[in-house]
């Protein structure tokens, strides 16, 4: 099995230079990098992660707990995380918890055993029990992303869901809608509480009220939006516009409405939330609330790497500011 000395000899460089090239820890001339990587490939060299971690007290790995990796919103944010980790020479261990407490505990224990250098947490389902377990790991640098609970011991990214809910509802009101319903996520989740608070704030500012029958509790999945729309269409007094708390529910709502022969936006207007890539290509293209997902992913890693370098760094809070992306799914009355 090839060693770092073999690579250095073949590339005509020092072992220190080989280490810097492989770990991306210092600038090395492009021509030198090319020789090193050619030697690595020719010798099929794989550095020992165990030896490196013992020598440097670092594994160059980051763990990530995420609720649902298959949801487009999470997938796009994770792309930003993974891409920036790779550029910085870190390997990402992504753990899809699916909201299961036992899986969350198992993955957290596994990541601790792997001696990851830091942890990103993007779980809406963090309960007090798991949060307490996270806070026991005071030596582990950690960034709470998106919907996670607040903690004085971790850096945090805030998505300003209340502001987003307000902007979405205000946009519908500005287009003449006074009969507005919404398809929410689980109402016990912090992000849903914030978005519906923004929804009611916009209505209140316009001296409007919402029929409680027009508030449909979903779960951020397509099937819940489809069932909600089915209930809505059976009502005699229907809203003229729906605010869906994420884009995939909005797209499901549009599909269900169109299957009944009604038109979006001529008969019912729809606004979504997240601005996933697919939303621009649906029919009609979806008006939605934009969140800079890939940039947030990159920022989360930047904050975490700062924390890894300096565990006593002042706590950082990064705020996202949502904005309306106007397309074709909202009709002006």
UniProtKB/Swiss-Prot annotation:
Kindly list the cysteine pairs connected by disulfide bridges: none
What pathway annotation does it carry?
Answer: Purine metabolism; purine nucleotide biosynthesis [regulation]
Q: Which residues bind hypoxanthine?
A: 73, 189, 191, 220, 274
Keyword line: DNA-binding, Purine biosynthesis, Repressor, Transcription, Transcription regulation
Q: Which residues mediate DNA binding here?
A: 4-23, 48-56
Matches recorded under InterPro entries = HTH_LacI, LacI/GalR-like_sensor, Lambda_DNA-bd_dom_sf, Peripla_BP_I, Tscrpt_reg_HTH_PurR
Boundaries of each HTH lacI-type domain copy? Answer: 2-56
**Could you name the domain of life of the organism this protein comes from?**
Bacteria
Q: Which GO terms describe its molecular function?
A: DNA-binding transcription factor activity; transcription cis-regulatory region binding
Q: Name one GO biological process term.
A: negative regulation of DNA-templated transcription
Pfam families per UniProt = LacI, Peripla_BP_3
Q: Which residues form the signal peptide?
A: none
Q: What does this protein do?
A: Is the main repressor of the genes involved in the de novo synthesis of purine nucleotides, regulating purB, purC, purEK, purF, purHD, purL, purMN and guaBA expression. PurR is allosterically activated to bind its cognate DNA by binding the purine corepressors, hypoxanthine or guanine, thereby effecting transcription repression.
Record text on subunit structure and interactions: Homodimer.
Q: What is known of its domains?
A: Consists of two structural and functional domains: an N-terminal DNA-binding domain, approximately the first 60 residues, and a larger C-terminal domain, approximately 280 residues, which imparts the function of corepressor binding and oligomerization.
Q: What is this protein called?
A: HTH-type transcriptional repressor PurR
Gene name in the database record: purR
């Amino acid at each position: 099995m090839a060693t770092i000395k073999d690579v250095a000899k073949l590339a005509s460089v020092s072992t220190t230079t080989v280490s810097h090239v492989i770990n991306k820890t210092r600038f090395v001339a492009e021509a030198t990098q090319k020789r090193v990587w050619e030697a690595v490939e020719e010798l099929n060299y794989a550095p020992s992660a165990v030896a490196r971690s013992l020598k440097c007290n670092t594994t160059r790995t980051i763990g990530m707990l995420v609720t649902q990796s298959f949801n487009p919103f999470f997938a796009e944010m994770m792309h930003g995380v993974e891409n920036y980790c790779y550029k910085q020479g870190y390997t990402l261990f992504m753990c899809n918890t699916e909201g299961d407490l036992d899986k969350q505990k198992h993955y957290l224990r596994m990541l601790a055993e792997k001696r990851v250098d830091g942890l990103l947490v993007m779980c809406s389902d963090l309960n007090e029990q798991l949060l307490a377990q996270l806070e026991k790991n005071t030596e582990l640098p950690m960034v709470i992303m998106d919907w996670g609970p607040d903690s004085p011991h971790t850096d945090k990214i805030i998505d300003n869901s209340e502001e987003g809910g307000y902007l979405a509802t205000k946009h519908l009101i500005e287009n003449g809608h006074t009969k507005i319903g919404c398809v929410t996520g689980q109402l016990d989740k912090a992000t849903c509480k914030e978005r519906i608070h923004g929804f009611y704030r916009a209505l209140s500012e316009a001296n409007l009220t919402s029929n409680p029958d027009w508030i449909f509790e979903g779960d951020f999945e397509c099937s819940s939006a489809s069932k909600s729309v089915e209930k809505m269409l059976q009502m005699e007094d229907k809203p003229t516009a729906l605010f869906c708390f994420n884009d995939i529910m909005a797209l499901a709502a549009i599909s269900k409405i169109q299957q009944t022969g009604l038109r979006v936006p001529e008969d019912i207007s729809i606004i979504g939330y997240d601005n996933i890539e697919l939303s621009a290509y649906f029919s009609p293209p979806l008006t939605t609330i934009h969140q800079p997902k890939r940039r947030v992913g990159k920022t989360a890693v930047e904050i975490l790497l700062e924390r890894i370098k300096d565990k006593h760094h002042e706590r950082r809070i990064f705020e996202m500011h949502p904005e309306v992306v106007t397309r074709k799914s909202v009709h002006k009355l």
